[in-house]
């Protein structure tokens, strides 16, 4: 299973990505769903700025299965829902990386790739 993490561009001006990467490598928080899998590979770590459609095309070429939106995107980006919906046209989307599935701004968006049934964070 191939994973990509998309973070908030403005946050990346001061963030090293440590929280997202720690959660991935420790298989905690949003990545706990993969704890029993050995085939999980992080193939991209990028921000939401720039040419999103070009990034989507590249992620599709890399055969990404799931995109995790960073927790800072959920908490601070007014386009969080629209971004998740657009990405769900081509990928399964998990709308947070570290911390709880239910954050201070509400529950994280969890979407299956378009055409599939919605999933919950516990699946």
Describe the role of every protein-language-model region.
Residues 62:
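Active-site charged/polar residues at nucleotide-handling catalytic sites that mediate phosphoryl
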Residues 1-59, 70-80, 93-94, 99-123:
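Conserved mixed alpha/beta catalytic, RNA-binding, or beta-rich assembly cores of soluble enzyme
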Residues 79-89:
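Short, aromatic/basic amphipathic alpha-helical patches
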Residues 65-66:
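Structural motif
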